[in-house]
A protein has these predicted regions:
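Bacterial N-terminal signal peptides that target proteins for export
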Residues: 1-10
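Beta-lactamase-like hydrolase cores
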Residues: 15, 21-79
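Surface-exposed patches in mature extracellular/periplasmic domains of secreted proteins
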Residues: 56-63, 103-110, 131-135, 156-162
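Flexible glycine/proline-enriched surface loops and loop-helix/loop-strand junctions
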Residues: 72-77, 114-117, 125-131, 155-162
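A glycine-rich, coil/turn loop motif that links secondary-structure elements
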Residues: 76-81, 108-112, 160-169
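Active-site SXXK
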Residues: 79-103, 109, 122
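Active-site helix/loop module of the DD-peptidase/beta-lactamase fold
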Residues: 103-125, 145-157
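Mid-domain, small-residue-enriched loop/turn segments at the edges of structured enzyme/sensor domains
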Residues: 131-180
């Protein structure tokens, strides 16, 4: 059955959607990127911080160029609320166990979810339920946080006690994990 009103409404909605996507695309065409030639990462980040009024109270950064080896850190040991960042070292922990032959991708993490599926859901879709199942297999939160220490270069003296009990990490910890 043909419904001309529904067809027209659907076309209008599609046209509005396409138009709303075209406006930012057209604006992007007129954007002129800043000239960064001859500037170091530090100079670029310092200019960005100045432009956006960022300082050690509201900005933390760790940068590493995998091609050149260039790195830059700013306020990199300041602990901040971790959100889903805990999933990076958590998944690496299980990948290490797989490489050591201690566990396989077919190992069931929950009823119905293998380790391979848990990795995928945790890293691609940020699935909290499966990620929680992964860290609970290690132990409680302080035990999980202790197990993750093997990926970090920070010394015991550099890591405050609240690291073990709060959901906090710093950019240096995450960068260390990425470099493993």
């Amino acid at each position: 059955m043909h419904h001309p009103f529904r067809t027209a409404a659907a076309l209008a909605i599609c046209a509005a959607g396409l138009f709303s996507m075209a406006v930012p695309a057209l604006a992007a065409e007129s954007f002129t990127p800043p000239d960064v030639s001859g500037k170091s990462v530090e100079e670029l980040i310092d200019a960005f911080r100045e432009e956006h009024n960022l300082d050690e109270t509201n900005f933390e950064l760790s940068y590493y160029n995998t091609v050149s080896g260039e790195s830059y850190d700013y306020n990199e040991t300041k602990l901040l609320y971790g959100a889903s960042t805990y999933k990076l070292p958590l998944n690496l922990y299980y990948y290490d166990m797989q490489l050591a032959g201690e566990i396989t991708g077919d190992t069931m993490i929950t009823q119905g979810s293998s380790l391979d599926e848990a990795h995928y859901q945790s890293l691609v879709y940020s699935n909290n339920e499966l990620s929680y199942s992964l860290w609970r297999r290690i132990g409680d939160w302080p035990e999980y946080k202790m197990a993750m220490r093997k990926y970090f270069t920070m010394t015991d003296d550099e890591i405050p006690q609240n690291y073990y009990y709060d959901h906090v990490f710093c950019t240096r910890m995450m960068m260390d994990t990425l470099k493993v």
